[in-house]
UniProtKB/Swiss-Prot annotation:
This is Glutamate--tRNA ligase 2. A motif ('HIGH' region) lies at residues 10-20. Pfam families: Anticodon_2, tRNA-synt_1c. Transmembrane segments: none annotated. The keyword Protein biosynthesis applies. One of its GO terms (cellular component) is cytosol. ATP binds at K245. One of its GO terms (biological process) is glutamyl-tRNA aminoacylation. The lineage of its organism: Bacteria, Pseudomonadati, Pseudomonadota, Alphaproteobacteria, Rickettsiales. One of its GO terms (molecular function) is ATP binding. It catalyses: tRNA(Glu) + L-glutamate + ATP = L-glutamyl-tRNA(Glu) + AMP + diphosphate. Catalyzes the attachment of glutamate to tRNA(Glu) in a two-step reaction: glutamate is first activated by ATP to form Glu-AMP and then transferred to the acceptor end of tRNA(Glu). Monomer. The gene is gltX2.
Length: 474
C-alpha cells in the first residue's frame, strides 16, 4: 500500500463528541498501522460559530485520548485565498460560473417544486450564460461562484465500507464554491485542503456520503486523484435512534469528568464498528497492530453504557497503583489541601480501593477514608450499627490494636478473629462496627487492610470517637 496519509478535520463549533472521537481514532490507527501519517486540520472557516474555547477543547480531548497527530495543526482559515484561487481556475476553465440568482429567487423555485410535489434541484439560468454574467460581474452585482456539476450520467463511489455507491448526476446540484462575501464554502475548502495535504484515505461518518459524490465530481473537474473513501455508520443511542444529548453524555470532556480512563474510552470506541475475532479488551498498542479498514462493519453501532462502564472498571483494576493514586490525588486536591501523609495513605490503599470502583470519581470518593483532612461522613446504615454497638466492645478492640507489636494485615486478622471467638461473635458482627467507625460506611476494602494503612494513631482515634458519634446522632 502507498504511503498512507489520513486526517481528522473537526469544526470548532462545539466540543469533541464521541462520534468525532471514534472517527479520529480510526484515522489515527489506520495511519499508524501502515506507518503513515495522521494529520489534524481545524476547519475554522465558520467565524460566527467557531470559538477558541471549542478549538482548545478539541485539541485537549485528542491529547487526553492519546490520539497524537503528525506535523503542525493545519488551520483551514489560513488557506482561504488558495481556496478562492482554485474556484477562479475552475471558472477560467469553464467548470464553474458566476451566478447572480438571488436567494429569494431560489426560495421561490423551491416553493414551486414543493407545491408540485417534486424534488428540488436548483438549476441556475447563469450556468451557460457566460457573456451576461461577466457583464454583471463588471458592474459589481452580487454573485456567488457555482460548480458546473455534471448533469448526465453517474458518479460512482467505490467505498471500502459501503461498497459501490452510484449517484445519478441529474440529482446533484451546482453547489456554491464561493459565497457572495468572497469566502469559500466547506465543499470547496475540504477538497482543496485534502489534495494539498496529500490525504490518501478519508474515514468519516456515512452522513457524508452524499457530499462525497459532489466532492468526487469536483476532484474530476480539477484533474486531481480523489482519496479513497471509507464511510462508517454513525453511532446510535441504546434505543436505536440517532445519538443526541437526551441519551446522556456525548462529549469526550464529559466522560473525562465522569471518571473514565482514556484507554477504556478508546477501547470501547474501537469496538463500535470495528472488530477483530472475539477480542473485547484491546490495548492502544495492540489496536495499532491489528487495526485495518477491512475490519469495519456496515451496520450501525449502538452505545452500551453498561459495557463502557465495565471496560472502565477493567482498566482501573489493570492500571498501576501509582498512576491511579496520582489521578485520584489530582481529583481530591480540588476539595482538600492534602498532606504528604494523606497522599501516602492513598497510595498504600490503592490495591484495596480499585477493586471496588468502575469510575475514577468513585475511586476518589472511596479514597476519602485515607484523607486525614476529611471529616468522615456516616451513611445512615453505619450510624445505626454504631448506635447499637457497646462502647466497651470498641474499647477492647482499641486495646488489641495498641498492643500489637507488628501492625499488618495478618496480625490484625489473627487478633480480631481470636477476639471474636472469645466474645462468641461471628467475625462479620465484629467487623461491621469497626468498618462503620473507620470508614463511615458499610462497604469498604478489607478492614484487615484499612487498619494497618491508617496506622495505630489514626485508627485508634477514629474508633475512640464512638461516644461522640453516638451523642451527636441521637
Amino acid at each position: 500500500m502507498t504511503n498512507i496519509v489520513t486526517r481528522f478535520a473537526p469544526s470548532p463549533t462545539g466540543f469533541l463528541h464521541i462520534g468525532g472521537a471514534r472517527t479520529a481514532l480510526f484515522n489515527y490507527l489506520f495511519a499508524r498501522h501502515h506507518k503513515g501519517k495522521f494529520l489534524l486540520r481545524i476547519e475554522d472557516t465558520d467565524a460566527a460559530r467557531s470559538t477558541e474555547e471549542y478549538k482548545l477543547g478539541i485539541i485537549d480531548s485528542l491529547k487526553w485520548l492519546k490520539i497524537n497527530w503528525d506535523n503542525d495543526i493545519f488551520y483551514q482559515s489560513a488557506n482561504l485565498q488558495r481556496h478562492v484561487n482554485v474556484a477562479l481556475e475552475l471558472v477560467k476553465s469553464g467548470k464553474a460560473y458566476y451566478c447572480f440568482t438571488s436567494q429569494e429567487e431560489i426560495d421561490l423555485q423551491r416553493q414551486l417544486a414543493i407545491a408540485q410535489k417534486q424534488s428540488f434541484i436548483f438549476r441556475s439560468p447563469w450556468r451557460n450564460n457566460i457573456p451576461s454574467s461577466l457583464s454583471l460581474k463588471n458592474n459589481n452585482k452580487a454573485y456567488v461562484i457555482r460548480f458546473k456539476a455534471p448533469n448526465h450520467g453517474t458518479t460512482i463511489i467505490n467505498d471500502y465500507v459501503q461498497g459501490k455507491v452510484v449517484f445519478q448526476n441529474q440529482q446533484i446540484d451546482d453547489m456554491i464554491l464561493v459565497r457572495s462575501d468572497g469566502t469559500p464554502t466547506y465543499m470547496l475548502a475540504v477538497v482543496v485542503d485534502d489534495h494539498d495535504m496529500g490525504i490518501t484515505h478519508i474515514i468519516r461518518g456515512d452522513d457524508h456520503l452524499t457530499n462525497a459524490a459532489k466532492q468526487i465530481a469536483l476532484y474530476d473537474a480539477l484533474g486531481w486523484k480523489a482519496p479513497a473513501m471509507v464511510h462508517i455508520p454513525l453511532i446510535y443511542g441504546p434505543d436505536g435512534t440517532k445519538l443526541s444529548k437526551r441519551h446522556g453524555a456525548i462529549g469526550v470532556d464529559a466522560y473525562q469528568k465522569m471518571g473514565y480512563l482514556p484507554e477504556a474510552l478508546c477501547n470501547y470506541l474501537l469496538r463500535l464498528g470495528w472488530s477483530y475475532q472475539d477480542e473485547e479488551i484491546i490495548s492502544h498498542e495492540r489496536a495499532i497492530k491489528l487495526f485495518d479498514i477491512d475490519g469495519l462493519g456496515k451496520s450501525a453501532a449502538r452505545l452500551d453504557f453498561d459495557k463502557m462502564l465495565y471496560l472502565n472498571g477493567y482498566y482501573i483494576r489493570s492500571t498501576d497503583n501509582s498512576i491511579l493514586a496520582k489521578l485520584v490525588i489530582e481529583i481530591l486536591s480540588k476539595q482538600y489541601i492534602l498532606s504528604n501523609e494523606s497522599c501516602n495513605l492513598i497510595q498504600k490503599g490503592m490495591s484495596g480501593l480499585k477493586s471496588r470502583a468502575n469510575l475514577l470519581t468513585d475511586l476518589a470518593e472511596n479514597a476519602k477514608i485515607y484523607v486525614l483532612e476529611n471529616q468522615l461522613t456516616f451513611v445512615n446504615e453505619a450510624l445505626n450499627i454504631i448506635q447499637k454497638t457497646p462502647s466497651m466492645l470498641i474499647t477492647e478492640v482499641i486495646d488489641i490494636i495498641n498492643n500489637l507489636q507488628e501492625l499488618n494485615c495478618e496480625s490484625v486478622k489473627q487478633s480480631l478473629t481470636e477476639f471474636a471467638k472469645v466474645k462468641h461473635m461471628k467475625l462479620g458482627q465484629l467487623m461491621d462496627p469497626i468498618r462503620a467507625l473507620l470508614t463511615g460506611n458499610t462497604k469498604s476494602p478489607s478492614i484487615f487492610e484499612v487498619i494497618p494503612i491508617l496506622g495505630k494513631i489514626h485508627a485508634v482515634k477514629r474508633l475512640a470517637d464512638i461516644e461522640a458519634i453516638k451523642s451527636n446522632n441521637q
